[in-house]
Amino acid sequence: MRGEFYQQLTNDLETARAEGLFKEERIITSAQQADITVADGSHVINFCANNYLGLANHPDLIAAAKAGMDSHGFGMASVRFICGTQDSHKELEQKLAAFLGMEDAILYSSCFDANGGLFETLLGAEDAIISDALNHASIIDGVRLCKAKRYRYANNDMQELEARLKEAREAGARHVLIATDGVFSMDGVIANLKGVCDLADKYDALVMVDDSHAVGFVGENGRGSHEYCDVMGRVDIITGTLGKALGGASGGYTAARKEVVEWLRQRSRPYLFSNSLAPAIVAASIKVLEMVEAGSELRDRLWANARQFREQMSAAGFTLAGADHAIIPVMLGDAVVAQKFARELQKEGIYVTGFFYPVVPKGQARIRTQMSAAHTPEQITRAVEAFTRIGKQLGVIA
C-alpha cells in the first residue's frame, strides 16, 4: 500500500511534467532587486517580483532590520499570547491600523494565515460568505474552513453580486460578508469597491478586502484600493501582507474594528498557534511605513515606470490586460507560446514567468509583468525591445 502511494506521486509528477505544468524553481544568487544574478552567473532584469516600491534590498530597511535584531533578538520562540509579544509588535500593529484608517490590526505569519484564520473565527453556519470568483487561493481556502453558506459571483460583476446577496438574505442568513481581492493579481485589475460597498450598504452586509497587491502604492497616499476607490471607512476588514510592496520579506495582518481584532486574538488558530513575527521583520516593517508616509517619490517612480512600459508595449502591438496598476499582463493565449516566450526573454536578460492553465483560464496564457520603482527607464526600454524581437519571431506581433 505504501509503495502504491509513492508510485502514485511519481506518476502525478511525470504527468505534470509531460503536460508542461511542472513548476521549476529558478535559483537567484543575489539579493532581490531590479538587476538580479541567477544560478549560471548571468545578470537579468527582474520583471516578475512583487517588489513594487523597490524596497526588498533597500539599505535603510536592512539597517532597521539589523537594529531590530540588536535590540530585540533574532526570534521570539513563542506564540503571541504566551511570551511572544514585544513592544515593537504592538507598535507595528498600531501603525498599520492608522495607515489603513482602521481602528486596530493584528499580525500574522503571512497573509495566507490571516485569510485562513479569518472566516471560521468570525462566522458560523447561520451566516453567508459571498466571494469573488477570482479571489486569491488564501481566501478560497479560508472560506472552505468556515461553516457559513458559500456563494460566488463572477469577477467584479456587480449585477451577479447583488443576485447572490438577495439569495443569501432570502435564505435567512444572519450575517453576510462579501469577500474580494482589492487587486486581482493575474489581471492587474482593481476591484470595484465602490460598487461592492454600495451593495453592502443596501443589503446590510460586511465587506472584507485582501489588499496585498495595493497597500503601499495604490491610492493617493498608498493606503490601498479602498483609498483609490474612495471608500475608506466603508470597508470592514482589510487583510494584507508585508511580503510585497512593504519590504518584501514576510508577515501578514488583518485590520478592522477593535472588537473584530480582539476576537481574532482570542480565537484565530493561525494566530494562536504560530510563532510571532521575527523582530527584524517587525523593525523593518515599521521603517517601511515611515518611508511610505514620508513622501510619494517611490510611488511616483513606480507609476512612471508602469506608464512607460504600457505605452511602449501597446505601441509595439501587444495586447495588455489590466489598467491603473503595476501588474501588466502581456496576453499571449497559447500556453506553449507563453512558456517559450518566457524562456527566450531570459536568454535576452529579461526575467519573467509565463502563466497558463490551471493558473489562468485555458486560452488566456500570459506573461505577467510587474513594474517596480527600482527599474530605470533604460531597463524598461530594454525589456520592451526584447519583447518586441521575440514577439515578432514567435508571430505574436507583426
UniProtKB/Swiss-Prot annotation:
Its EC number is 2.3.1.29. Transmembrane segments: none annotated. One of its GO terms (molecular function) is ligase activity. Keywords: Acyltransferase, Pyridoxal phosphate, Transferase. Binds 1 pyridoxal phosphate per subunit. The modification N6-(pyridoxal phosphate)lysine is found at residue 244. Pyridoxal 5'-phosphate binds at residues 111-112, 185, 210-213, 241-244, 274-275. Pfam families: Aminotran_1_2 (PF00155). Pathway: Amino-acid degradation; L-threonine degradation via oxydo-reductase pathway; glycine from L-threonine: step 2/2. It catalyses: glycine + acetyl-CoA = (2S)-2-amino-3-oxobutanoate + CoA. Gene3D superfamilies: Aspartate Aminotransferase, domain 1, Type I PLP-dependent aspartate aminotransferase-like (Major domain). Substrate binds at residues 136, 368. GO terms for cellular component: cytoplasm; cytosol. Its cofactor is pyridoxal 5'-phosphate. GO terms for biological process: biosynthetic process; L-threonine catabolic process to glycine. Homodimer. Catalyzes the cleavage of 2-amino-3-ketobutyrate to glycine and acetyl-CoA. HAMAP family: 2am3keto_CoA_ligase. This is 2-amino-3-ketobutyrate coenzyme A ligase. It comes from Escherichia coli (strain K12). The lineage of its organism: Bacteria, Pseudomonadati, Pseudomonadota, Gammaproteobacteria, Enterobacterales.
